[in-house]
Structure formats: structure tokens, C-alpha cells
């Protein structure tokens, strides 16, 4: 059962560990504290399309699921990465892996949010890093 306050009440579902109401989540990433909220991003597999899911908390126990942060596009699926607070530009910055639809090749992309992570704009020149080698994923950026 899914409760309106966002806490799952199923017998075998974790009570504190964040979990999705439906579909499959994995790879928590981009954990960041910004303007009074902890942000948890994760891979969110919705019918074989990989997004960055998003949840926020003020206490790391009670989580509120937000709309997906970053959606797949014509370049590819959105895989793991990291997020940082860009204080100079008053925004959050996310760096993620693209898994290209046709070739499966991996590259890195970026997106930015100016409203506490509620909406995201992908960098217009994505992908920002490419490489022909396999397993070119999971960028880690920190400040």
C-alpha cells in the first residue's frame, strides 16, 4: 500500500530506505544538500526507458517523490552520474551518462536547474565528453 505521506506500508518494503511506488529504481546518485533539502537522484527504469528519478527530504527519513529530473532524449537513456551545487551561478548542476539508443556507446551529458531541482535544462551542446572505449560511464563531480 502507498500512503499519501510517501511512506510505504507493505510488509516487506523498507520503512526508511527510499523505494519507488512502481517500476524499478537503482543506482542512487547525485546526492546533494541545497537550500534546506537533501536531493536524491537515481536511475528510474520506466518500461525500459531510463530516467533520473528525484526525491527530496529535510531529514533523510521522510522522502517526497518529485517528477523525474532528467528524461531520455534523442541521444540516449540517462544513466548514473553526480550532482553539485554551483553557488556562483545559483543553480544545481547534474552530470550523467548517456547510453546511446542505437550503438549503446556511452558519453557524458550535463543539465542545470535554477529552481531547486524542480525543473532541469540539458546543456545544449550535449554530449560534453565522448569516448570510443566501452564502459565510459558514471561521472563523479564534486566541489
Regions found by a protein language model. Give the residues of each.
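Beta-rich carbohydrate-recognition and catalytic domains
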Residues: 1-143
Amino acid at each position: 500500500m502507498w500512503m499519501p505521506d510517501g511512506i510505504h506500508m507493505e510488509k516487506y518494503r523498507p520503512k526508511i530506505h527510499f523505494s519507488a511506488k512502481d517500476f524499478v529504481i537503482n543506482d542512487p546518485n547525485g546526492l546533494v544538500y541545497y537550500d534546506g533539502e537533501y536531493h536524491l537522484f537515481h536511475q528510474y527504469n520506466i518500461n525500459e526507458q531510463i530516467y533520473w528519478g528525484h526525491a527530496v527530504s529535510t531529514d533523510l527519513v521522510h522522502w517526497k517523490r518529485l517528477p523525474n529530473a532528467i528524461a531520455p532524449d534523442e541521444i540516449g537513456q540517462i544513466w548514473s552520474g553526480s550532482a553539485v551545487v554551483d553557488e556562483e551561478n545559483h543553480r544545481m548542476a547534474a552530470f550523467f551518462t548517456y547510453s546511446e539508443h542505437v550503438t549503446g556507446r556511452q558519453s557524458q551529458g550535463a543539465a542545470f536547474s535554477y529552481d531547486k531541482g524542480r525543473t532541469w535544462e540539458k546543456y545544449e551542446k550535449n554530449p560534453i565528453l565522448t569516448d570510443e572505449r566501452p564502459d565510459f560511464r558514471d561521472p563523479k563531480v564534486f566541489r
